[in-house]
Amino acid sequence: MTAAFFAPAAYYSEDWKLFQRNEWMGTTGKQVNDFKDMVKAFHKENIAVIMDVVYNHLSEYEIGNLKQIDKEYYFRLDEKGNFIAQSYCGNDLKTEAPMMRRLIIDSILYWMKEYHVDGFRFDLGKLIDWETIESIIREAKKINPNVVFVCEPWGGGYDPQGFSLRGWGAWNDQIRNGIKGENPNDGHGWIFGKWYGNNNIDRIKSYVNGTLIKDKHGLFQKKEHSINYLESHDGYTLGDFIRIGTGEVKRDSIINDVDKNVKLSAQQEKLNKLAALFLFTSQGITMIHSGQEFARSKVIPKNIDVADPHKGMIDHNSYDKDNETNYINYNHAEINYDLLDYYKGLIELRKTYEAFRKAEYENINFTEVPDNKFALAYSLKYNGYEFLVMFNACQNIEAKFPVAENHWEILVDNKKAGTKSLGIAPAEIILSPISGTVLKRIK
């Protein structure tokens, strides 16, 4: 998207065996029909297509682009005529320029009309000026009143509230850092029994509620504006963050056996499950990254024919790698099948019971947990159902929660998750370190 704003990349539609460097690709136009067929196939399964778009900077490698047409008009420059690069990608587009704004809007409308895309996720959304954002909303809704807009609410600033006021969803990096942490070496979050930055139990409760502005440190007007996530294309995968965070793998370790590295230890599996349970039971929109459900690991292959001082190590910034570092190895789903099955159960739970998506703020009630600052418990009600959700993120002590005996059935524990009963809850729930549970009231 940073080169051709109106065309799908032919590379992903070509037979890679016929790929030749320094030769034109996509001359048959096959990629256009392939993309349209893909959208049709998703729509047939009632799956919306949200496309990642980049309108804040331009590719550094394309010939005949806007740099050659009119650098001063299309780009933000400093007083010496150099590119401003708050995107950290070499240049920032001047989205406020009328013809740049028109290009962006025309591109959005084209993807909606020609390819029937249902929505867009904007890279570094804060680098796009508000007038352009509002024009996009106005014009796109003429085509589809239900068009979806999501963004990274940073880049040249940080303003999730500004996007929420305009009806956009935004990636919630606060829940990401608060729950997981920011750095696997010395910036651990709640699942590790730590407070990252200015996080505390009240912020954790706010994340459960959808990080709403009615809470002291909230960001969003509506819970559906909070895109809750713990892993994306940037940074370590959640699985690798936990591998390094436990100290079982070093950041600069050379991985000689990738399959062995992928296999989760008991401690790593508990942390992955606790993180997933919090993510899927929090109000807002749940986002997971490809392979997160089986703790995918990004290991740079040793046998690549390019110079890389980090060969054999876990990668934390793999944007530039078209090799096994970024390929999804589904054999690893079998290696960590218990985690995969846990994710499947949590997805089923969230889809079946709307309480985990639509519970009103007033119907989520927290219970104080004495003597364990990393334990959390709350009840939620919606549409005739009532649930108890309990967590113990402490690393070394149990958490005890009294409940009414014979009134609750267990749907999630530290091993299984889903909608089938795992048994009747006793009068006291005892959670071992790094675990959680979900109970449903028996009608």
Regions found by a protein language model. Give the residues of each.
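Loop/helix patches that line or flank the sugar-binding groove of alpha-linked glycan CAZymes
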Residues: 224-408
